[in-house]
Amino acid sequence: MTQISTPARRQVERFLDFSDHVGGLEEADVLALLRDHDITTLEQLVAKAVRAPRSAEPVPADPARTLARPKAATALATARITHPAPAMAVVVDGVEHDPADLTRFDGRPLTYLYHPERLTAVTDDTAVNGALWAAALLRDPRPATRGEVQMFEHVEYAGDWFWCPARQAYNDLTDVHHGPLHLHDWNDVISSMGGTNCTVRYYEHINFGGSSLIVPPFSDIPNLVPSGWNDRISSVWNHG
């Protein structure tokens, strides 16, 4: 048997165990996908896996940044922004709107507050940002016991998944890969997420730009389709 270091062996075993994240796989489907990527030999498969890009790690989230959008996000906010019609009631600035009527806000980012039966949104999130900032300062500095939020590729918590720890953020999900060969990234892929004891904010653009969805603690969301946020998330901020 070939002798390799324990750390190297663990990394190889993690690569070989990737299918645990995606459920049952058919051999023919796997081989067909590999051929699509010009992988027909064991050597080519290993070379591809070794050269695969590494995912970006989440970075510590500074509560003070909650008070103002980063410059990159401000620039993105001036780009074309559209609001998909959710399949639930929506209230904007205290006024209930027909979901299809959200087009009147196209070109302007909205901040949504998630509820399983309705969405509440504001055009000016200054007060919301202040509340999040204050909550972060008053929170116990010890690590949260269930702080990680788990996000899934498909509805009903299916497919691949990844995590974002408490008080951490991913500013660009195009840099966070999934699958053993890292053929895909997590940008505009999230379709459901598990509950955590943290407040989590999801943004439609990278660098925390565009509209955002604030999900309160202990909120399981098995399906993002009704809210209009399915396959729409490009950055994540776990406020802890």
Describe the residue ranges of each PLM region.
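Compact beta-sheet-dominated domain cores in extracellular/mature segments
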Residues: 2-240
